């Protein structure tokens, strides 16, 4: 097998997939009937089928990201899929190819390489290499520039816009039907689970606001491309994320622009993959020259590049939307820091706003699939409809404990590591999403706030994969 992200290599797969496995992306299988049995033997890196008529080499099974997104066999399946376009191996190949084109002055085919880095991987890298979070961002910029990157960006502006869109969407939904629960949509593991397991029952509850990763893709492939006066297809956009499922999200057909003939995000690498790349280079992050992150959005550059969004650890959706809705709908402005009440476990918490003795807003945070499954079952029984908004994340403790964050050192417990990352996060400055930059982007590039263009670029739709599966069962093999 070619060298892929070690955490993503297949560990258990049968090379022969038959229709009995009910793949909803079936391929025609040319299988000749045999009167005698056959044995499959594995020799070296190849498999052979042996029978009385001789032996033949079996074709290697190939699974694409699109197959994975459409498959009903798993939930967060990124760890078990042979990924060919979403690995550090592919990233290095593109960078080397780009370097060769520069050397031969093939300028028409040279691509602009843009890296967008989320906050959680910076926390993970800062802890791993024992440096400050802002320092980690600057050393990472130096590392990516040494590989051939042209721009290294923070995802802060995309995080800001995602919160602005989500809060406005909630207020509109609440005013139309205050009894309809709204579920956050920034976690692709949760979205895949909703589409593949519960389909049309759950999808009307899910927010249509794109995740910060995909909003960043819009900013890079539309706004930055326009500023640089180059086609979006000439930009190779790489994001650095805390979660393998972000690779699946970037590969959705919904995030391929036919107008630009380009994906909004071309490649996703993760915290642990950055650590692997540095290990293979036998370097530590701090050994690379620190460089400023780029800020192509305006002439006014912020002093700091790494920010927190509220005090919760996955983008601050529940907290930010709660405060905005309290003010916008009920003219209530919470003066103190919000305190979420822990329920059955630390990954399920709620907060309530009361007015005149009545509960008018009830929000929750549900992290981890145990809590998600319980929440969905309550929705089906009509027992969770009193929640107006639920921030849903597939990983326990949320994105800060994403499945692709750097692993604990020997002898260190996951909870201890998560606690240290939480401390780093809580020491970051707080971002106010409604700022001069986001106002500038809405005004100059999105035709204003709540316009047709802003909705087209900042929102998405979902697919009832459960129904697609039932249709596929009627295929004649």
UniProtKB/Swiss-Prot annotation:
It comes from the Eukaryota. Gene3D superfamilies: 3.40.50.1780, Fe-only Hydrogenase (Larger Subunit), Chain L, domain 3. GO terms for biological process: iron-sulfur cluster assembly. Keywords: 4Fe-4S, Iron, Iron-sulfur, Metal-binding. GO terms for molecular function: 4 iron, 4 sulfur cluster binding; metal ion binding. InterPro entries: Cytosolic_Fe-S_CAF (IPR050340), Fe_hydrogenase (IPR009016), Fe_hydrogenase_lsu_C (IPR004108), Fe_hydrogenase_ssu (IPR003149). Pfam families: Fe_hyd_lg_C, Fe_hyd_SSU. [4Fe-4S] cluster 1 binds at residues 23, 68, 71, 74. [4Fe-4S] cluster 2 binds at residues 187, 243, 395, 399. Component of the cytosolic iron-sulfur (Fe/S) protein assembly machinery. Required for maturation of extramitochondrial Fe/S proteins. Belongs to the NARF family. This is Probable cytosolic Fe-S cluster assembly factor GE22682. It comes from Drosophila yakuba (Fruit fly).
